[in-house]
Amino acid sequence: MRVLAAMSGGVDSAVAAARAAEAGHDVTGIHLALSRNPQSYRSGARGCCTIEDSNDARRAADVIGIPFYVWDLSDRFHEDVVEDFMAEYAAGRTPNPCLRCNEKIKFAAVLDRALGLGFDAVATGHYARLVAGADGLVEMHRAVDHGKDQSYVLGVLDQGQLRHSLFPLGGSTKDEVRREAAERGLLVADKPDSHDICFIADGDNAGWLREKLGDRAPHHEGTIVDDDTGEVLGRHEGSYGFTIGQRKGLRIGRPAPDGRPRFVLDIEPVSGTVTVGPHERLAVHRLRGIRPRWCGTVPDRLSGTVQLRAHGEEHRAVLVRDGDEVDIELLEPAYGIAPGQAAVLYDGSRVVGSATISATDRVAAR
């Protein structure tokens, strides 16, 4: 089988490419150039967009003994991921750019191009497992290493994409992968994992948004108000710098009368008003999801679990499909859930699909 191995310059994608080659596949490595200005990223930045990362990927391909190329998808990435990220925050929502990248870039633009060039599959270093289902469908399950499981950010993939995907690391732990990399002589064996949003080099999301959005945001400045009294507690430089559940960086002039910390409860991008209050008012019992993406069979109703953050806990939930939208009832409350986040649905370890949260039903305890 002809396999295109996406190599970020990190240890996971390098070992995934090596395993694909060792399995007898005809493997070609590629590095995705996603930044329009990679020189702006400092050496050692914990992302995958630096020139250093590209060089690390090339050296790994040389060690493995596979051809290697760089594909420039920077314009497509900027349009589909970066611009979407800015627009979502400007609208008061909290997007996950990693899911967007998987949906629009790695398993769409890259996969489509790979298939057009005669490749049979794309291999990545994601931690997830693919197994053959009894109904002939390809099922995606959580990885063996639950601490590194990345099935959440892959919950946007459908059958057409899963059938042409390989995740060679799904049955391994991270420690095993690092040991194997060292044994194979891969210089990235001890390279730190990337955690930050790859196109925000210093990790300062609010500062980056302020610089990039500028006057494009509906309200550059606004007020921070108390949920109980409506009193103005402070001002801010842009509602796009906040997310639901945020506690730090509010810069409120005085503490609450009861001394408890305040959290962001609501963001109104049109007026620029950010409402804050106690933690218990973040409790969410019901979600509305739009743009569902199904990994296989489309359920009308499902009792399973839902994950609401990339490394968040699972919540027992009941899903009811309503046309092109879904209603998700949480059997226990979740806290700090924001519109724009992804709700990824599971039946045991199997990924059922995902939806973008459009609304939440908060039960305000007063």
From Swiss-Prot:
Region annotation (Interaction with tRNA) ranges: 148-150
Disulfide bridge map: 101-198
Pfam families reported for this sequence: tRNA_Me_trans, tRNA_Me_trans_C, tRNA_Me_trans_M
UniProt-listed Enzyme Commission number(s): 2.8.1.13
Active-site positions on this chain: 101, 198
GO terms, biological process: tRNA wobble position uridine thiolation
Subcellular location(s) per record: Cytoplasm
Positions bearing the site annotation: Interaction with tRNA: 126, 341
InterPro entries in alphabetical order: MnmA-like (IPR004506), MnmA-like_C (IPR046885), MnmA-like_central (IPR046884), MnmA-like_central_sf (IPR023382), Rossmann-like_a/b/a_fold (IPR014729)
Principal subcellular localisation of the protein: cytoplasm
Domain of life: Bacteria
Binding site for ATP: 6-13, 32, 125
Protein role: Catalyzes the 2-thiolation of uridine at the wobble position (U34) of tRNA, leading to the formation of s(2)U34.
Entry's family note: Belongs to the MnmA/TRMU family.
Protein name per UniProt: tRNA-specific 2-thiouridylase MnmA
Origin species: Nocardioides sp. (strain ATCC BAA-499 / JS614)
